[in-house]
């Protein structure tokens, strides 16, 4: 039986992952990259290019290079979103006979699912090269706020690419699954997902082994693309002021501006200022024109502030729908490349009143979650004989691949217990019941006993149908599981018997594994926190060096730069919490010496000829920064 892969089909980039030996792996593409640009191009020779190679030639071939196709998935041509996209995108968008938005390249019309399928095929091929076997099944993620037509379009893209789409799952749910937060108890979490083209906020409640999505909201037309557009518009307006030329009429110039805007935006996540240099951007009667501008982080934040603020309204709605306040959220998870923007992180932190969790790569986490879900769906059925008491908990897989216990371990038999579940999607007419035994929080980590399906559920909005799942262990230790639709009375059941059950040693091993994983989760969190602390310290000290560098002796500057590099190296390479903390402490001491030197110099200048009010203010600034560093 072949492997099923997990795919994050993104607006800007796409990622493919697979679970190998119980661990999710992000699969590199043919160019060795872990993310693949969601770009498709057609050359004048009739060649089709996908990914990085397509993105590289976009400047010289803008009309035949398709990007951000996800924004057109499942949309009507006359929709406001498509009409807005037409103004911005260099390729031709046309109306299909059914009213959908299609693209036209060299006289040939393509549907968005067709273009998306080309991206999926590249990812499928990368997975086959990696695994050395054909891949025919996948779980593909979509924004939680995607409507039915957008979801169907995504599923169609999979079929076109030769993939049997086992499931379409929501990106925030996949992210929560990959982060492993489902292993914690009694937690309310918010997943803030700002990607290249879409924004989602999901409020999830985790407790007693169940992931329950309490509310979701979002904007399927808000993302990093819009940030790029703001920078592009600023560049165009500034250039127009300088040269009197409107670059909007030049498609090749627009493509260069788009790439430069995206690059500048990314650089400003770590730098305070960046230079945008586009020689020969255009020409007029007087000769060629060059674009050379500086963009500061502060200016970028000013340009995109309303976009970031726009994401807060869905957050408020989702919290309201969930019946929760910001203070009741225990953990905030950032997903999507655009959440690397410091201003986004600050706004989210201010809104929820707590620092967001940054433990996993926001570009890859959704694909990893999809791969885990794919592995869960491909679980092998194994029969087992149960003993007089049930030594391990029995339950089923629920939303997000979580193990929901129905009968706890050490329950005396015979026993019979029931629980009511519901559907996870609108108009769902069937549910698959997967029966597991074990103590781990994720179903895939436990032992799969059997699978059966309840069909014929009348179509209804998700959350409306009531499915009663009953576990019945008789005196012979035989487990019967049934699922009944309470509205129609339709029922399906499975009887699990086996010639050999779990041995005592296997039971002990499962318990040990569960405990070991709990410890491992704690250790990973400690490492993430230590690295965050190191990042903060490095940023603070580097800022002090930039601001006060001319007042520090050369020897002292050299010592502190060495301490910064050492701290950064250890942070990036070490998995030892104590080693990272020691490096942070060493850097803190080095920065403290700088503070003392600055303080002494400030004191000496005060004793000189009458210090001015301005110098006193500077002293105050220095002291405040020293205090802030020490507090950290």
Curated annotation (Swiss-Prot):
Keywords: ATP-binding, Chaperone, Nucleotide-binding, Phosphoprotein, Stress response. Induction: By stress conditions e.g. heat shock. Residues 620-632 have a biased composition (Acidic residues). One of its GO terms (biological process) is protein refolding. The modification Phosphothreonine is found at residue 198. One of its GO terms (molecular function) is ATP binding. InterPro entries: ATPase_NBD, Chaperone_DnaK, Heat_shock_70_CS, HSP70_C_sf, HSP70_peptide-bd_sf, Hsp_70_fam. Acts as a chaperone. PANTHER family: HEAT SHOCK PROTEIN 70KDA. Belongs to the heat shock protein 70 family. This is Chaperone protein DnaK. It comes from Thermodesulfovibrio yellowstonii (strain ATCC 51303 / DSM 11347 / YP87). The gene is dnaK.
């Amino acid at each position: 039986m072949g492997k099923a892969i997990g795919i994050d089909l993104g607006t800007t980039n796409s990622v493919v992952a697979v679970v190998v030996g119980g661990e999710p792996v992000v699969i590199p593409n043919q160019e060795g990259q872990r993310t693949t640009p969601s770009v498709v191009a057609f050359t004048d020779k009739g060649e089709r290019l996908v990914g990085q190679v397509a993105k590289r030639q976009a400047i010289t071939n803008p009309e035949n290079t398709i990007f951000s196709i996800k924004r057109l998935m499942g949309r009507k041509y006359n929709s406001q979103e498509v009409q807005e996209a037409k103004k911005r995108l260099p390729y031709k968008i046309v109306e299909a006979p059914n009213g959908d938005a299609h693209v036209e390249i060299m006289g040939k019309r393509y549907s968005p699912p067709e273009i998306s399928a080309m991206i999926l095929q590249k990812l499928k091929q990368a997975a086959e090269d990696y695994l050395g076997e054909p891949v025919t099944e996948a779980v593909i993620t979509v924004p939680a706020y995607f409507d039915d037509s957008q979801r169907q379009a995504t599923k169609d893209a999979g079929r076109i690419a030769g993939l049997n789409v086992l499931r379409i799952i929501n990106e925030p749910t996949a992210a929560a699954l990959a982060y492993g937060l489902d292993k914690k108890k009694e937690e309310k979490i918010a997943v803030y997902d700002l990607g290249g083209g879409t924004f989602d906020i999901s409020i999830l409640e985790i407790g007693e082994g169940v992931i329950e999505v309490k509310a979701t909201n979002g904007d399927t037309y808000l993302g990093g693309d819009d940030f790029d557009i703001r920078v592009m518009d600023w560049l165009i307006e500034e250039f127009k002021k300088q040269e009197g030329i409107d670059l909007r009429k030049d498609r090749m110039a627009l493509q260069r501006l788009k790439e430069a805007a995206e690059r500048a935006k990314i650089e400003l996540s770590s730098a305070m200022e960046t230079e945008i240099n586009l020689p020969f951007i255009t020409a007029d009667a007087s000769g060629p024109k060059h674009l050379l501008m500086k963009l500061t982080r502060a200016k970028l934040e000013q340009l995109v502030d309303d976009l970031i603020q726009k994401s807060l309204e869905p957050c408020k709605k989702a919290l309201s729908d969930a019946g929760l306040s910001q203070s009741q959220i225990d953990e905030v998870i950032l997903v999507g490349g655009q959440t690397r923007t410091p201003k986004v992180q600050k706004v989210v932190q201010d809104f929820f009143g707590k620092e967001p969790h940054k433990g996993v790569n926001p570009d890859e986490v959704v694909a990893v979650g999809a791969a885990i879900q794919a592995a869960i769906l491909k679980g092998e059925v194994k029969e087992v004989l149960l003993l007089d008491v049930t030594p391990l908990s029995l339950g089923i897989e629920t939303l997000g691949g979580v193990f929901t216990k129905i009968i706890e371990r050490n329950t005396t038999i015979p026993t019979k217990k029931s629980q009511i579940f519901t559907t996870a999607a609108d108009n769902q007419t069937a549910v698959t019941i997967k029966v597991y035994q074990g103590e781990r929080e994720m179903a895939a980590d436990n032992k799969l006993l059997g699978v059966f399906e309840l069909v014929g559920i009348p179509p209804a909005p998700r959350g409306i149908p009531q499915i009663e799942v009953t576990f019945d262990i008789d005196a012979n230790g035989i487990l019967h599981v049934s699922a009944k639709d309470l509205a129609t009375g339709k029922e399906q059941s499975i009887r699990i018997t086996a010639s050999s059950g779990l041995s005592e040693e296997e039971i002990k091993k499962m318990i040990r594994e569960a405990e070991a994983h709990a410890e491992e989760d704690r250790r990973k969190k400690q490492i993430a926190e230590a690295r965050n602390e190191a990042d903060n310290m490095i940023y603070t000290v580097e800022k002090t060096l930039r601001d006060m560098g001319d007042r520090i002796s050369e020897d002292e500057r050299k010592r502190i730069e060495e301490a910064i590099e050492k701290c950064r190296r250890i942070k990036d390479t070490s998995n030892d919490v104590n080693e990272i903390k020691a490096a942070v402490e060493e850097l803190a001491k080095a920065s403290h010496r700088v503070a003392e030197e600055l303080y002494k110099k400030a004191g000496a200048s005060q004793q000189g000829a009458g210090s001015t009010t301005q110098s006193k203010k500077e002293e105050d600034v220095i002291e405040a920064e020293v205090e802030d560093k020490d507090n950290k």
